Structure formats: structure tokens, C-alpha cells
A protein has these predicted regions:
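Residues immediately within or flanking Cys/His clusters that coordinate Zn2+
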Residues: 14, 32
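Short cysteine-rich clusters marking metal-coordination/redox-active sites
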Residues: 17-20, 35-38
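Short, non-ligating residues that shape and space the ligands of small metal-coordination modules
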Residues: 26-27, 44
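Walker A/P-loop NTP-binding active-site region of P-loop NTPases
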Residues: 44-108, 112-116
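Loop/turn-to-beta-strand initiation segments
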Residues: 78, 110-111, 156-159, 190-198
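Phosphate-binding/switch loop-helix module in NTP-utilizing enzymes
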Residues: 120-183, 189
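Phosphate-binding/switch region of NTP-binding enzymes
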Residues: 193, 198-257
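C-terminal regions of RecA-like/P-loop NTPase motor modules
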Residues: 244-281
Length: 281
């Protein structure tokens, strides 16, 4: 029996990504059109930079870093993920989604390295090749980052990701943590790499947040809004050294395999964002 005219299920309009021209996917739960064909603004970042990413718990800081690790691995640039907020064993599942089940391959080639900076809090030994014995020891952390930086530089521009710096502020005086992050950021960038750190908003004083923003080339903020009973996530570029900041809050989709932003159908808006991410001075 044919379908009765007028009772057909509504179809979702096709929408093309303004960057790559491919059809966007549609998430019915979040009602978000997202692109899973191109890398969007991550491809505009320079190889060598420093960045701080802030936002409340659940805003998507860790998934964004996981997504970027996949981008860098696909392009032959090694990433080191210093896991302070959870054990690598718990991160491998979500990270496997963003790497499209190539995580083991990337780890085998040295393109992704997970460092256990979490297990020591429970007094147990981590199973990772690299792990901190005392996650409150900034000297140990500094030596470990330096060793990893030396090992990874031969593979390409290394990306050091510290997720997150929040626990460090609970163990040490804020000025010591700020000084440590400043030193590490400068060291990694001087070796042609990138240093990225996340921070839970509301856990550190605004003064120290501003000090960290001053240190970093880029400052990215994430937030969660409640809209008609649904959570909506947004992102904005709060600082870009040497460039005019793209000041608007941008809707962002955080999926299990893809992350995508939406600034509308006007390519000129994406061009403004691209210029904001141009190489910092």
C-alpha cells in the first residue's frame, strides 16, 4: 500500500558546509547541523602556538582536545596528552571515537602519547609508559614534559596538552602554577611545538585567569546555555595575540566522533574567524 499523501514524515532540509561544500549531518537531539567532512578552524592554527581553554565542567574542553589530537595525528604531528582529570584507561574509549578506532595505530607510531597524571592520587601505579609519581610535584612534571618534548620533536611539531591545570591550583600557590605554565608554554613554543592547557572556569581567581590569558597566544572560552529545556554549547575566541578577536559566541556541536562549529551560511564570517586564528606575532 502506498504512503498516503500528506502524511509523509518530514524531511530535514539539506544544508551544505560553507567551508568544504559537502552536505552537513543533522543531530536531531541537539537540532544542530554539523560537518564531519572538514577540520574547520583547527586547520587554521599555526604549528607553533600557546593556548588556554576555559569552561565549566561538561562544556566540552576534553572532547575538543581529543578531536584536535586526531587532526594532528592524521597530519603526522605528535601529541602528548597529560591526563590530570581522569585516567587514560577511561579516556581511551572516547578518544577512540574521535580517532575513528585508529588510536592504537597512532600510539604505536608515537603520534599520540597518553600520560597518566591521575592514578597517583589514589596511590596506585598507572599502566601507561609515562606516568607521574606525584602529580603535585611541578619539578617532576617539568622534567617529564622536557623529556617528552625531546623525544617527540624528531617526529614533527609536538603538541603538549595539559588537561587540566585545575588540580595544580589545588596543590600549589597560584603564582607558582602560573609561573610553571608560563615556563612550559615558552619552552614548548621555542621548540616549534604547541602548548595547550584547559582550566575549569570558576575554580581560579579572575586575576590568575587574566594572567594566564596574557601569557598565551590564544584564549578560548566554552559555555553551556539552557534553551527551551535543552543544553546548548557555545565557544568564542577571547584572545588572539596580534589579531583582532572574533568576539561572537559561536554554537558548537560536541559529538562522539565529530566536533563542529556553526557561524551561519555566510563564508565571510568564516573568513573573519580564519583571520583571527592566523599566526600570532
Amino acid at each position: 500500500m502506498g504512503r498516503i499523501r500528506g502524511l509523509e514524515a518530514p524531511t530535514t532540509p539539506i544544508r551544505l558546509c560553507p567551508l568544504c561544500g559537502e552536505p552537513s549531518a543533522f543531530d536531531e537531539i541537539t537540532e544542530f547541523y554539523y560537518c564531519n567532512h572538514c577540520d574547520q578552524f583547527i586547520q587554521w592554527l599555526p604549528d607553533s602556538y600557546t593556548m588556554m581553554m576555559t569552561g565549566p565542567p561538561g562544556a566540552g574542553k576534553t572532547p575538543v582536545l581529543h578531536h584536535w589530537m586526531d587532526f594532528y595525528a592524521r597530519n603526522g604531528r605528535p601529541s602528548v596528552f597529560l591526563a590530570f582529570d581522569d585516567s587514560p584507561a577511561n579516556l581511551r574509549g572516547p578518544l577512540g571515537g574521535y580517532t575513528h578506532e585508529k588510536l592504537s595505530e597512532y600510539e604505536g607510531h608515537g603520534l599520540i602519547t597518553l600520560v597518566d597524571c591521575y592514578s597517583s592520587i589514589a596511590g596506585v601505579s598507572g599502566r601507561e609508559k609515562y606516568a607521574l609519581k606525584n602529580r603535585a610535584d611541578l619539578n617532576e612534571l617539568s622534567l617529564l614534559i622536557t623529556d617528552l618534548l625531546n623525544a617527540m620533536t624528531s617526529l614533527g611539531s609536538p603538541k603538549i596538552m595539559l588537561d587540566s591545570a585545575t588540580p595544580l591550583f589545588t596543590y600549589k600557590e597560584p603564582q607558582l602554577v602560573v609561573q610553571f605554565l608560563s615556563t612550559m608554554a615558552a619552552k614548548v613554543k621555542s621548540r616549534g611545538g604547541a602548548f595547550l592547557t584547559s582550566l575549569a572556569s570558576g575554580t581560579v581567581s579572575e586575576e590568575n585567569v587574566r594572567r594566564l590569558q596574557t601569557i598565551m597566544d590564544f584564549a578560548v572560552e566554552l559555555r553551556i546555555l539552557e534553551v527551551e529545556g535543552r543544553q546548548k554549547r557555545q565557544v568564542r575566541l577571547a584572545k588572539a595575540r596580534g589579531q583582532r578577536v572574533y568576539e561572537e559566541w559561536i554554537p558548537i556541536y560536541i559529538g562522539k566522533e565529530a566536533i563542529s562549529i556553526d557561524v551561519g551560511d555566510d563564508p565571510a564570517k568564516y573568513e573573519r574567524l580564519r583571520k583571527a586564528f592566523e599566526s600570532p606575532s
